[in-house]
């Protein structure tokens, strides 16, 4: 007589026990000061953010710049010659970048509805708020953000970092250097520069007369140093460097 058997059953919850995932960590933004910058914890990431580039951005926005920097000011005139532009700190630029990474998953992948809702809430929170936490019902998290879904979400963020590293530094060879995304009421542009990634957020207004959308002159921008993302990317360390991709002496940042 044939009998039921559990001979090949997998051990129970081995992965979850060994990894010890904190699913609520996606709903918390922990920022702490460190030497020369900040440490940010979100999800299963720990980012070490230096205060790199802030002084340079403020110099470029002033009128007292060396002639070699004028080309950079002209190229990004809506940032450096615009009285309505504002410089944000690197940890806020990183927050915007992470919000875009989640939004990229939400828009491009076939996510199950409940999981998509959580990704949407998290991305909107990162993009539109500066609070340290967002309340998501524990029941909702338990049902739709399982340990497997958590891993998928974090892997998607790493894939977005990898996508950023395929960009070339701003160049005159026509090679792609930016990722752009339009959301409700705002446009976000992430551009690769010598020092890392320039993140800009522009509001989209609606003309009262005709209902057409136009980009507002108000823009907020900041710089995320390359090292912040590189330690979490999967770029092969031994791959040959493309100088167009990694450096351009014609731009100041």
UniProtKB/Swiss-Prot annotation:
Monomer or homotetramer (Potential). Interacts with the nucleoprotein. One of its GO terms (molecular function) is structural constituent of virion. It comes from the Viruses. Keywords: Host cell membrane, Host membrane, Membrane, Viral matrix protein, Virion. It is a peripheral membrane protein. GO terms for biological process: viral process. May act as a minor matrix protein that plays a role in assembly of viral nucleocapsid and virion budding. Unlike Ebola VP24, mVP24 has no measurable impact of host dendritic cell function. Disulfide bonds: none annotated. Belongs to the filoviridae membrane-associated protein VP24 family. It is found in: Virion membrane; Host cell membrane; Host endomembrane system. It comes from Lake Victoria marburgvirus (strain Ravn-87) (MARV). InterPro entries: Filo_VP24. This is Membrane-associated protein VP24. The gene is VP24. The lineage of its organism: Viruses, Riboviria, Orthornavirae, Negarnaviricota, Haploviricotina.
């Amino acid at each position: 007589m044939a009998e039921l058997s559990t001979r090949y059953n997998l051990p129970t919850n081995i992965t979850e026990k060994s990894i010890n995932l904190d699913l609520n960590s996606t709903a918390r933004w922990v920022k702490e000061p460190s030497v020369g910058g900040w440490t940010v914890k979100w999800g299963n990431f720990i980012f070490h953010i230096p205060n790199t580039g802030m002084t340079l951005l403020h110099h470029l926005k002033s009128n007292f710049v060396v002639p070699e920097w004028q080309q950079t000011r002209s190229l990004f005139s809506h940032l450096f010659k615009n009285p309505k532009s504002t410089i944000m700190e690197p940890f806020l630029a990183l927050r915007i970048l992470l919000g875009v990474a989640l939004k990229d998953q939400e828009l491009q992948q076939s996510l199950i509805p409940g999981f998509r809702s959580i990704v949407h809430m998290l991305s909107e929170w990162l993009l539109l708020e500066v609070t340290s936490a967002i309340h998501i019902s524990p029941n909702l998290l338990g049902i739709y953000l399982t340990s497997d879904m958590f891993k998928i979400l974090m892997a998607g963020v790493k894939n977005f970092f990898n996508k950023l590293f395929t960009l070339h530094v701003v160049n005159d060879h026509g090679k792609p250097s930016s990722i752009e995304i339009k959301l409700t009421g705002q446009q976000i542009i992430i551009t690769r520069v010598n020092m890392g990634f320039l993140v800009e957020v522009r509001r989209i207004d609606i003309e009262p007369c005709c209902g057409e959308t136009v980009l507002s002159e108000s823009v907020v921008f900041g710089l995320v140093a390359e090292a912040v993302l590189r330690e979490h990317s999967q770029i092969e360390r031994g791959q040959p460097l493309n100088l167009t991709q990694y450096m351009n002496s014609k731009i100041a940042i």
